[in-house]
Amino acid sequence: MDEIGGDGRQGEYRRQKKEHIPFIYIRQRYEKLLFPRFSLAYNLLICPMSYNSLRTSKNINKTKFIRLMKTFRLLIVALLLAGSASAQRYERRAMRGEYSPTVYLISVQEVDTIYNYGPYAMQQAAVLNRMAMDNATQDYIETHRPGFQQVEKPQFVFATKNNLFSFSLGGFVSLRAGYDFDGIVDNIDFVTYDIPVHGSYDTRQKLMMDASTSRLFMKAITNTRALGRVVVFMDADFRGGAEGSYTPRLRSAYVSFLGFTLGRDVTTFCDLSAAPTTIDFQGPNAYNFNFATMIRYEYAFADNHLKFGVAAEMPSVSGTYNDNFATLKQRVPDFPAYFQYAWGANRDSHIRASGVVRNMYLHNLRTGNNTSLLGWGVQFSGTIKVAQPLRLFMNGVYGKGVTPYIQDLTGSGLDFTPNPENADQIQTMPMWGWQAAAQINLTPRLFISGGYSTVRVQRSHGFYSDDQYKQGQYIFGNIFYSITPRCKVAGEYLYGSRKDMSNDKGHANRVNVMLQYSF
Protein backbone atom coordinates (compact mmCIF):
# COMPACT_ATOMS: atom_id res chain seq x y z
CA MET A 1 0.00 0.00 0.00
CA ASP A 2 1.53 3.24 -1.16
CA GLU A 3 0.22 5.79 1.33
CA ILE A 4 2.12 8.94 0.42
CA GLY A 5 5.46 7.27 0.24
CA GLY A 6 4.86 4.35 2.65
CA ASP A 7 7.91 3.60 4.82
CA GLY A 8 5.90 3.55 8.04
CA ARG A 9 4.29 6.90 7.37
CA GLN A 10 0.71 5.65 7.65
CA GLY A 11 0.27 7.83 10.75
CA GLU A 12 1.05 10.94 8.75
CA TYR A 13 -1.35 9.81 6.04
CA ARG A 14 -4.10 9.27 8.62
CA ARG A 15 -3.53 12.71 10.10
CA GLN A 16 -3.64 14.28 6.65
CA LYS A 17 -6.72 12.32 5.71
CA LYS A 18 -8.40 13.18 9.00
CA GLU A 19 -7.69 16.86 8.43
CA HIS A 20 -9.16 16.64 4.95
CA ILE A 21 -12.46 15.00 5.90
CA PRO A 22 -14.05 18.09 7.55
CA PHE A 23 -13.42 20.18 4.46
CA ILE A 24 -15.03 17.60 2.13
CA TYR A 25 -17.96 17.28 4.52
CA ILE A 26 -18.39 21.04 4.74
CA ARG A 27 -18.23 21.44 0.98
CA GLN A 28 -20.81 18.72 0.33
CA ARG A 29 -23.09 19.83 3.16
CA TYR A 30 -23.01 23.60 2.65
CA GLU A 31 -22.00 24.20 -0.96
CA LYS A 32 -25.55 24.64 -2.22
CA LEU A 33 -26.48 26.77 0.77
CA LEU A 34 -23.51 29.15 0.84
CA PHE A 35 -22.08 29.09 -2.67
CA PRO A 36 -24.85 28.44 -5.21
CA ARG A 37 -23.09 30.60 -7.81
CA PHE A 38 -19.62 29.18 -7.30
CA SER A 39 -20.09 25.44 -7.75
CA LEU A 40 -18.06 25.49 -10.95
CA ALA A 41 -15.22 27.23 -9.15
CA TYR A 42 -15.21 24.54 -6.49
CA ASN A 43 -15.23 21.73 -9.05
CA LEU A 44 -12.34 23.27 -10.95
CA LEU A 45 -10.23 24.55 -8.06
CA ILE A 46 -11.10 22.52 -4.95
CA CYS A 47 -11.97 19.00 -6.05
CA PRO A 48 -8.68 18.32 -7.81
CA MET A 49 -6.96 18.99 -4.49
CA SER A 50 -8.14 15.83 -2.75
CA TYR A 51 -5.62 13.79 -0.86
CA ASN A 52 -5.24 11.33 -3.77
CA SER A 53 -3.73 14.12 -5.86
CA LEU A 54 -1.02 14.57 -3.25
CA ARG A 55 0.72 11.32 -4.16
CA THR A 56 4.02 12.49 -5.48
CA SER A 57 7.48 11.08 -5.68
CA LYS A 58 9.54 10.59 -2.51
CA ASN A 59 12.01 13.32 -3.41
CA ILE A 60 9.34 16.09 -3.07
CA ASN A 61 8.78 17.73 0.25
CA LYS A 62 5.25 16.41 0.71
CA THR A 63 4.45 18.27 3.91
CA LYS A 64 5.20 21.69 2.40
CA PHE A 65 3.25 20.81 -0.72
CA ILE A 66 0.22 19.79 1.35
CA ARG A 67 0.37 23.01 3.36
CA LEU A 68 0.60 25.04 0.16
CA MET A 69 -2.50 23.36 -1.24
CA LYS A 70 -4.35 23.86 2.04
CA THR A 71 -3.48 27.56 2.09
CA PHE A 72 -4.63 27.98 -1.51
CA ARG A 73 -7.84 26.15 -0.76
CA LEU A 74 -8.49 28.19 2.37
CA LEU A 75 -8.02 31.45 0.49
CA ILE A 76 -10.61 30.52 -2.11
CA VAL A 77 -13.14 29.35 0.48
CA ALA A 78 -12.70 32.49 2.58
CA LEU A 79 -13.16 34.81 -0.39
CA LEU A 80 -16.26 32.96 -1.58
CA LEU A 81 -17.73 32.93 1.91
CA ALA A 82 -17.21 36.68 2.37
CA GLY A 83 -18.66 37.48 -1.04
CA SER A 84 -21.67 35.21 -0.62
CA ALA A 85 -22.51 36.24 2.94
CA SER A 86 -22.26 39.97 2.30
CA ALA A 87 -24.22 39.70 -0.95
CA GLN A 88 -27.04 37.76 0.75
CA ARG A 89 -27.04 40.24 3.64
CA TYR A 90 -27.19 43.22 1.30
CA GLU A 91 -30.10 41.72 -0.61
CA ARG A 92 -32.11 41.12 2.57
CA ARG A 93 -31.62 44.65 3.94
CA ALA A 94 -31.91 46.44 0.61
CA MET A 95 -35.37 44.92 0.18
CA ARG A 96 -36.34 46.61 3.48
CA GLY A 97 -34.84 49.96 2.46
CA GLU A 98 -32.14 49.84 5.16
CA TYR A 99 -28.51 50.87 4.84
CA SER A 100 -26.74 47.66 3.88
CA PRO A 101 -23.22 48.06 2.51
CA THR A 102 -21.20 45.21 1.13
CA VAL A 103 -18.82 44.39 3.99
CA TYR A 104 -15.63 42.44 3.30
CA LEU A 105 -14.12 40.89 6.42
CA ILE A 106 -10.33 40.85 6.50
CA SER A 107 -8.44 37.99 8.19
CA VAL A 108 -4.97 36.57 7.68
CA GLN A 109 -5.04 33.91 10.40
CA GLU A 110 -5.77 30.34 9.39
CA VAL A 111 -7.78 29.72 12.55
CA ASP A 112 -10.27 32.32 11.34
CA THR A 113 -11.15 30.35 8.21
CA ILE A 114 -13.81 27.68 7.92
CA TYR A 115 -11.36 24.94 6.90
CA ASN A 116 -10.73 23.71 10.43
CA TYR A 117 -14.37 24.01 11.52
CA GLY A 118 -16.92 21.27 11.87
CA PRO A 119 -20.57 21.92 10.94
CA TYR A 120 -21.49 23.35 14.36
CA ALA A 121 -18.34 25.43 14.61
CA MET A 122 -18.94 26.70 11.11
CA GLN A 123 -22.38 27.95 12.12
CA GLN A 124 -20.83 29.76 15.06
CA ALA A 125 -18.23 31.31 12.77
CA ALA A 126 -20.97 32.49 10.41
CA VAL A 127 -22.78 34.14 13.34
CA LEU A 128 -19.57 35.88 14.43
CA ASN A 129 -18.98 37.07 10.89
CA ARG A 130 -22.48 38.53 10.73
CA MET A 131 -21.90 40.28 14.05
CA ALA A 132 -18.66 41.75 12.74
CA MET A 133 -20.45 42.99 9.62
CA ASP A 134 -23.24 44.52 11.71
CA ASN A 135 -20.73 46.25 13.98
CA ALA A 136 -18.87 47.72 11.01
CA THR A 137 -22.15 48.88 9.48
CA GLN A 138 -23.18 50.48 12.76
CA ASP A 139 -19.90 52.41 12.89
CA TYR A 140 -20.71 54.04 9.55
CA ILE A 141 -24.30 54.74 10.54
CA GLU A 142 -23.28 56.46 13.78
CA THR A 143 -20.49 58.52 12.19
CA HIS A 144 -22.44 59.56 9.10
CA ARG A 145 -22.88 63.33 8.78
CA PRO A 146 -25.91 64.41 6.74
CA GLY A 147 -26.46 67.88 5.40
CA PHE A 148 -25.66 70.26 2.56
CA GLN A 149 -23.27 68.72 -0.02
CA GLN A 150 -22.41 65.79 2.27
CA VAL A 151 -21.69 62.36 0.81
CA GLU A 152 -23.92 59.33 1.28
CA LYS A 153 -22.90 56.41 3.45
CA PRO A 154 -20.37 54.15 1.66
CA GLN A 155 -21.47 51.05 -0.23
CA PHE A 156 -18.21 49.11 0.19
CA VAL A 157 -16.59 48.54 3.59
CA PHE A 158 -13.49 46.52 4.44
CA ALA A 159 -13.35 45.58 8.12
CA THR A 160 -11.37 43.40 10.50
CA LYS A 161 -13.28 40.69 12.31
CA ASN A 162 -12.45 42.16 15.71
CA ASN A 163 -14.06 45.48 14.68
CA LEU A 164 -10.92 47.46 15.49
CA PHE A 165 -10.49 48.90 12.00
CA SER A 166 -12.60 49.49 8.91
CA PHE A 167 -12.01 51.30 5.66
CA SER A 168 -14.35 52.45 2.91
CA LEU A 169 -14.24 54.12 -0.49
CA GLY A 170 -17.11 55.79 -2.29
CA GLY A 171 -18.37 58.75 -4.21
CA PHE A 172 -20.71 59.67 -7.00
CA VAL A 173 -20.74 60.76 -10.63
CA SER A 174 -22.89 63.83 -11.17
CA LEU A 175 -23.83 65.46 -14.46
CA ARG A 176 -25.48 68.88 -14.32
CA ALA A 177 -26.86 70.67 -17.35
CA GLY A 178 -28.27 74.18 -17.29
CA TYR A 179 -29.63 76.89 -19.53
CA ASP A 180 -29.70 80.62 -18.68
CA PHE A 181 -32.28 82.86 -20.34
CA ASP A 182 -33.48 86.45 -20.02
CA GLY A 183 -30.16 87.28 -18.38
CA ILE A 184 -27.24 85.07 -17.38
CA VAL A 185 -25.00 84.45 -14.40
CA ASP A 186 -21.33 84.82 -15.26
CA ASN A 187 -20.56 81.66 -13.29
CA ILE A 188 -21.18 77.95 -13.70
CA ASP A 189 -22.98 78.14 -10.33
CA PHE A 190 -25.92 80.45 -9.68
CA VAL A 191 -24.01 83.16 -7.78
CA THR A 192 -26.14 86.29 -7.74
CA TYR A 193 -23.06 88.46 -7.08
CA ASP A 194 -21.92 87.50 -10.64
CA ILE A 195 -25.09 88.63 -12.44
CA PRO A 196 -24.16 91.37 -14.95
CA VAL A 197 -25.96 94.58 -14.07
CA HIS A 198 -25.51 96.21 -17.45
CA GLY A 199 -26.23 93.45 -19.93
CA SER A 200 -25.13 93.16 -23.54
CA TYR A 201 -25.81 91.00 -26.58
CA ASP A 202 -23.68 88.27 -24.95
CA THR A 203 -25.57 88.12 -21.65
CA ARG A 204 -28.96 86.89 -22.84
CA GLN A 205 -28.68 83.10 -23.01
CA LYS A 206 -26.09 80.50 -22.02
CA LEU A 207 -25.81 76.69 -22.16
CA MET A 208 -23.84 74.73 -19.54
CA MET A 209 -22.90 71.09 -18.94
CA ASP A 210 -20.73 70.18 -15.98
CA ALA A 211 -19.47 67.03 -14.24
CA SER A 212 -16.86 68.72 -12.02
CA THR A 213 -18.97 68.24 -8.88
CA SER A 214 -18.48 64.46 -9.07
CA ARG A 215 -16.99 63.25 -5.82
CA LEU A 216 -14.54 60.71 -4.42
CA PHE A 217 -14.16 60.04 -0.71
CA MET A 218 -12.26 57.82 1.69
CA LYS A 219 -13.24 57.07 5.26
CA ALA A 220 -11.49 54.98 7.90
CA ILE A 221 -12.69 54.17 11.41
CA THR A 222 -10.51 52.80 14.21
CA ASN A 223 -11.94 51.75 17.58
CA THR A 224 -9.30 52.29 20.25
CA ARG A 225 -9.15 52.20 24.04
CA ALA A 226 -7.20 55.42 24.51
CA LEU A 227 -8.93 57.67 21.96
CA GLY A 228 -12.25 55.91 21.49
CA ARG A 229 -13.58 55.94 17.96
CA VAL A 230 -11.15 57.66 15.57
CA VAL A 231 -12.51 58.78 12.19
CA VAL A 232 -10.33 59.79 9.24
CA PHE A 233 -12.13 61.36 6.29
CA MET A 234 -11.01 62.80 2.96
CA ASP A 235 -13.03 63.84 -0.08
CA ALA A 236 -12.32 65.61 -3.34
CA ASP A 237 -14.13 66.97 -6.37
CA PHE A 238 -12.89 68.50 -9.63
CA ARG A 239 -13.34 72.22 -8.95
CA GLY A 240 -9.69 73.06 -8.27
CA GLY A 241 -8.90 75.12 -11.37
CA ALA A 242 -10.52 77.34 -13.95
CA GLU A 243 -14.04 76.56 -15.10
CA GLY A 244 -13.99 73.46 -17.30
CA SER A 245 -10.46 72.40 -16.33
CA TYR A 246 -11.62 69.52 -14.07
CA THR A 247 -8.63 70.00 -11.79
CA PRO A 248 -8.91 67.84 -8.65
CA ARG A 249 -9.63 69.79 -5.46
CA LEU A 250 -9.26 68.60 -1.89
CA ARG A 251 -12.46 69.52 -0.06
CA SER A 252 -12.04 67.92 3.36
CA ALA A 253 -9.17 66.12 5.08
CA TYR A 254 -9.50 65.65 8.81
CA VAL A 255 -9.19 63.27 11.74
CA SER A 256 -11.69 63.37 14.60
CA PHE A 257 -11.62 61.77 18.05
CA LEU A 258 -12.87 62.57 21.56
CA GLY A 259 -14.84 65.51 20.16
CA PHE A 260 -11.82 67.09 18.42
CA THR A 261 -11.58 67.67 14.67
CA LEU A 262 -8.15 68.46 13.25
CA GLY A 263 -7.63 69.32 9.59
CA ARG A 264 -9.70 70.86 6.81
CA ASP A 265 -13.48 70.80 7.03
CA VAL A 266 -16.60 72.92 6.58
CA THR A 267 -16.38 76.01 8.79
CA THR A 268 -17.80 75.66 12.29
CA PHE A 269 -20.01 78.70 11.63
CA CYS A 270 -21.96 76.67 9.04
CA ASP A 271 -25.05 74.73 10.11
CA LEU A 272 -24.97 71.85 7.64
CA SER A 273 -28.61 70.89 8.19
CA ALA A 274 -30.02 74.41 7.77
CA ALA A 275 -29.89 74.54 3.96
CA PRO A 276 -32.19 72.80 1.45
CA THR A 277 -31.05 70.43 -1.27
CA THR A 278 -30.44 72.15 -4.61
CA ILE A 279 -29.04 71.14 -7.98
CA ASP A 280 -27.22 74.46 -7.98
CA PHE A 281 -23.84 73.74 -6.42
CA GLN A 282 -23.71 77.15 -4.73
CA GLY A 283 -27.02 77.00 -2.92
CA PRO A 284 -28.86 79.94 -1.31
CA ASN A 285 -26.78 83.11 -1.38
CA ALA A 286 -27.25 83.85 2.35
CA TYR A 287 -25.93 80.43 3.39
CA ASN A 288 -22.31 80.01 4.52
CA PHE A 289 -20.86 76.77 3.16
CA ASN A 290 -17.09 77.32 3.03
CA PHE A 291 -14.05 75.27 4.01
CA ALA A 292 -11.33 76.13 6.53
CA THR A 293 -8.31 74.52 8.13
CA MET A 294 -9.12 74.23 11.81
CA ILE A 295 -8.82 72.86 15.30
CA ARG A 296 -12.35 72.27 16.58
CA TYR A 297 -13.93 70.83 19.70
CA GLU A 298 -17.58 69.72 19.94
CA TYR A 299 -19.50 68.17 22.81
CA ALA A 300 -23.05 66.83 23.03
CA PHE A 301 -24.86 66.29 26.32
CA ALA A 302 -28.33 66.00 27.88
CA ASP A 303 -29.07 62.90 25.81
CA ASN A 304 -27.90 64.73 22.66
CA HIS A 305 -30.49 67.47 23.11
CA LEU A 306 -27.75 70.05 23.66
CA LYS A 307 -24.49 70.52 21.79
CA PHE A 308 -21.83 73.18 21.53
CA GLY A 309 -18.71 73.67 19.45
CA VAL A 310 -15.80 76.10 19.29
CA ALA A 311 -12.90 76.33 16.86
CA ALA A 312 -9.81 78.19 15.77
CA GLU A 313 -9.81 78.46 11.97
CA MET A 314 -7.39 79.75 9.38
CA PRO A 315 -8.67 83.20 8.31
CA SER A 316 -9.48 84.29 4.77
CA VAL A 317 -9.58 88.07 4.32
CA SER A 318 -10.99 89.84 1.25
CA GLY A 319 -10.86 93.62 1.45
CA THR A 320 -10.66 96.66 -0.84
CA TYR A 321 -7.46 98.71 -0.61
CA ASN A 322 -6.64 102.16 -1.93
CA ASP A 323 -3.27 103.88 -2.32
CA ASN A 324 -2.96 104.31 1.45
CA PHE A 325 -3.28 100.64 2.48
CA ALA A 326 -1.68 97.33 1.52
CA THR A 327 -2.20 93.65 2.27
CA LEU A 328 -0.56 91.99 5.25
CA LYS A 329 -0.25 88.35 6.26
CA GLN A 330 -2.81 87.42 8.89
CA ARG A 331 -1.71 86.69 12.44
CA VAL A 332 -4.79 85.59 14.39
CA PRO A 333 -7.24 82.78 13.56
CA ASP A 334 -10.98 83.24 13.30
CA PHE A 335 -12.89 82.00 16.35
CA PRO A 336 -16.36 80.63 15.48
CA ALA A 337 -18.59 78.94 18.08
CA TYR A 338 -22.17 77.63 18.32
CA PHE A 339 -24.74 76.31 20.77
CA GLN A 340 -27.54 74.01 19.57
CA TYR A 341 -30.77 72.58 20.92
CA ALA A 342 -32.22 69.50 19.17
CA TRP A 343 -35.44 67.54 19.60
CA GLY A 344 -37.37 64.72 17.96
CA ALA A 345 -36.97 60.96 18.11
CA ASN A 346 -33.71 61.08 16.18
CA ARG A 347 -32.85 64.67 17.15
CA ASP A 348 -33.72 65.54 13.56
CA SER A 349 -34.99 69.04 14.39
CA HIS A 350 -32.83 71.74 15.91
CA ILE A 351 -32.17 75.44 16.31
CA ARG A 352 -28.67 76.88 16.62
CA ALA A 353 -27.07 80.17 17.66
CA SER A 354 -23.61 80.85 16.22
CA GLY A 355 -21.04 83.60 16.44
CA VAL A 356 -17.62 84.44 15.02
CA VAL A 357 -14.91 86.93 15.97
CA ARG A 358 -11.98 87.76 13.69
CA ASN A 359 -9.07 90.16 13.49
CA MET A 360 -8.01 91.40 10.04
CA TYR A 361 -4.52 92.85 9.57
CA LEU A 362 -3.40 95.36 6.92
CA HIS A 363 -0.57 97.87 6.45
CA ASN A 364 -1.02 101.65 6.47
CA LEU A 365 1.34 102.97 3.78
CA ARG A 366 0.86 106.58 4.84
CA THR A 367 1.95 106.08 8.46
CA GLY A 368 4.13 103.02 7.91
CA ASN A 369 2.32 101.14 10.68
CA ASN A 370 0.43 97.89 10.72
CA THR A 371 -3.17 98.05 11.82
CA SER A 372 -6.05 95.66 12.37
CA LEU A 373 -9.82 95.70 12.12
CA LEU A 374 -12.28 93.73 14.21
CA GLY A 375 -14.82 91.62 12.35
CA TRP A 376 -17.72 89.84 13.99
CA GLY A 377 -20.90 88.03 13.07
CA VAL A 378 -23.90 86.28 14.64
CA GLN A 379 -26.28 83.73 13.16
CA PHE A 380 -29.51 81.97 13.98
CA SER A 381 -30.21 78.78 12.01
CA GLY A 382 -32.04 75.49 12.13
CA THR A 383 -34.22 72.84 10.55
CA ILE A 384 -37.65 71.79 11.80
CA LYS A 385 -39.64 68.70 10.91
CA VAL A 386 -43.16 70.12 11.02
CA ALA A 387 -44.95 66.91 10.01
CA GLN A 388 -44.08 63.62 8.38
CA PRO A 389 -43.83 65.04 4.84
CA LEU A 390 -42.80 68.66 5.63
CA ARG A 391 -39.41 70.03 6.70
CA LEU A 392 -38.33 73.68 7.06
CA PHE A 393 -34.84 75.19 6.70
CA MET A 394 -33.60 78.64 7.65
CA ASN A 395 -30.65 80.78 8.64
CA GLY A 396 -30.09 84.48 9.23
CA VAL A 397 -26.73 86.19 9.69
CA TYR A 398 -25.61 89.72 10.55
CA GLY A 399 -22.13 91.12 11.06
CA LYS A 400 -19.29 93.38 9.99
CA GLY A 401 -16.37 92.16 7.91
CA VAL A 402 -17.60 88.56 7.63
CA THR A 403 -17.65 87.90 3.87
CA PRO A 404 -16.28 84.31 4.26
CA TYR A 405 -19.45 83.52 6.22
CA ILE A 406 -21.96 84.72 3.60
CA GLN A 407 -21.73 82.77 0.35
CA ASP A 408 -22.62 85.55 -2.05
CA LEU A 409 -19.91 87.82 -0.61
CA THR A 410 -17.00 85.36 -0.37
CA GLY A 411 -14.01 86.86 -2.16
CA SER A 412 -15.90 90.08 -2.95
CA GLY A 413 -13.45 92.49 -1.32
CA LEU A 414 -16.13 93.74 1.08
CA ASP A 415 -14.67 92.75 4.44
CA PHE A 416 -13.51 96.36 4.54
CA THR A 417 -13.29 99.34 2.18
CA PRO A 418 -11.74 102.82 2.38
CA ASN A 419 -13.95 105.37 4.09
CA PRO A 420 -15.64 107.37 1.29
CA GLU A 421 -15.49 110.49 3.49
CA ASN A 422 -11.82 110.09 4.47
CA ALA A 423 -9.43 108.14 2.24
CA ASP A 424 -6.91 107.90 5.10
CA GLN A 425 -9.31 105.66 7.01
CA ILE A 426 -10.57 102.17 6.33
CA GLN A 427 -13.76 100.60 7.67
CA THR A 428 -15.47 97.23 7.98
CA MET A 429 -18.70 96.87 6.05
CA PRO A 430 -21.98 95.93 7.78
CA MET A 431 -23.82 93.09 6.03
CA TRP A 432 -26.69 90.68 6.57
CA GLY A 433 -28.59 87.90 4.86
CA TRP A 434 -31.28 85.31 5.44
CA GLN A 435 -32.81 82.33 3.70
CA ALA A 436 -35.87 80.14 4.27
CA ALA A 437 -36.98 77.02 2.43
CA ALA A 438 -39.37 74.09 2.70
CA GLN A 439 -39.20 70.50 1.51
CA ILE A 440 -42.24 68.27 1.00
CA ASN A 441 -41.65 64.51 0.76
CA LEU A 442 -44.40 63.28 -1.54
CA THR A 443 -43.18 59.67 -1.41
CA PRO A 444 -40.06 58.01 0.05
CA ARG A 445 -38.44 58.51 -3.38
CA LEU A 446 -39.88 61.85 -4.46
CA PHE A 447 -39.69 65.31 -2.92
CA ILE A 448 -40.16 68.92 -3.98
CA SER A 449 -38.65 72.01 -2.37
CA GLY A 450 -38.49 75.75 -2.80
CA GLY A 451 -37.21 78.82 -1.03
CA TYR A 452 -36.04 82.42 -0.98
CA SER A 453 -32.71 83.96 0.03
CA THR A 454 -31.34 87.50 0.10
CA VAL A 455 -28.07 89.26 1.01
CA ARG A 456 -27.56 92.96 1.70
CA VAL A 457 -24.45 95.13 2.21
CA GLN A 458 -25.27 98.28 4.16
CA ARG A 459 -23.83 101.70 3.45
CA SER A 460 -21.30 103.12 5.88
CA HIS A 461 -20.45 106.81 5.44
CA GLY A 462 -21.92 106.53 1.99
CA PHE A 463 -20.53 103.96 -0.45
CA TYR A 464 -17.13 103.46 -2.01
CA SER A 465 -18.20 103.16 -5.68
CA ASP A 466 -21.39 103.17 -7.74
CA ASP A 467 -20.90 99.57 -8.91
CA GLN A 468 -20.38 98.26 -5.39
CA TYR A 469 -22.67 95.32 -4.55
CA LYS A 470 -25.74 96.30 -2.55
CA GLN A 471 -28.20 93.39 -2.65
CA GLY A 472 -28.69 89.95 -4.18
CA GLN A 473 -31.84 87.82 -4.32
CA TYR A 474 -32.09 84.06 -4.93
CA ILE A 475 -35.32 82.14 -5.58
CA PHE A 476 -35.51 78.42 -6.40
CA GLY A 477 -37.89 75.52 -6.85
CA ASN A 478 -36.93 71.92 -7.61
CA ILE A 479 -37.99 68.29 -7.71
CA PHE A 480 -35.84 65.23 -6.90
CA TYR A 481 -36.62 61.59 -7.68
CA SER A 482 -34.59 58.53 -6.64
CA ILE A 483 -34.81 55.91 -9.38
CA THR A 484 -32.84 53.53 -7.15
CA PRO A 485 -31.19 54.09 -3.76
CA ARG A 486 -28.01 55.04 -5.66
CA CYS A 487 -29.38 56.85 -8.69
CA LYS A 488 -31.40 60.06 -8.70
CA VAL A 489 -32.57 62.64 -11.19
CA ALA A 490 -33.72 66.20 -10.57
CA GLY A 491 -34.99 69.37 -12.21
CA GLU A 492 -34.79 72.95 -10.97
CA TYR A 493 -35.72 76.54 -11.77
CA LEU A 494 -33.78 79.54 -10.38
CA TYR A 495 -34.30 83.28 -10.48
CA GLY A 496 -31.77 85.78 -9.21
CA SER A 497 -31.05 89.48 -9.20
CA ARG A 498 -28.25 91.87 -8.25
CA LYS A 499 -28.57 95.53 -7.28
CA ASP A 500 -25.62 97.93 -6.99
CA MET A 501 -25.22 100.92 -4.69
CA SER A 502 -26.30 103.09 -7.61
CA ASN A 503 -29.59 101.10 -7.63
CA ASP A 504 -28.84 99.72 -11.09
CA LYS A 505 -30.15 96.16 -11.29
CA GLY A 506 -29.64 92.99 -13.32
CA HIS A 507 -31.41 89.64 -13.22
CA ALA A 508 -31.10 86.09 -14.57
CA ASN A 509 -33.13 82.89 -14.99
CA ARG A 510 -31.79 79.35 -15.08
CA VAL A 511 -33.18 75.86 -15.61
CA ASN A 512 -31.08 72.95 -14.28
CA VAL A 513 -31.33 69.19 -14.66
CA MET A 514 -29.17 66.58 -12.96
CA LEU A 515 -28.36 62.87 -13.05
CA GLN A 516 -26.32 61.46 -10.19
CA TYR A 517 -25.16 57.91 -9.44
CA SER A 518 -23.49 57.01 -6.14
CA PHE A 519 -21.09 54.14 -5.58
Question: Where on the chain are the PLM-derived regions?
Answer:
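Outer-membrane beta-barrel translocator domains and adjoining extracellular loop/strand segments
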Residues: G183-I188, E243-L250, S273-D280, G319-T327, ...
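N-terminal periplasmic/intermembrane-space "pro-region" immediately following the signal or transit peptide
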Residues: A87-F181
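Residues that define the transmembrane beta-barrel architecture of outer-membrane proteins
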Residues: F165, Q205-S214, T247-R251, S256, ...
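Outer membrane beta-barrel
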Residues: T160-N187, Y201-S318, P336, Q340-W343, ...
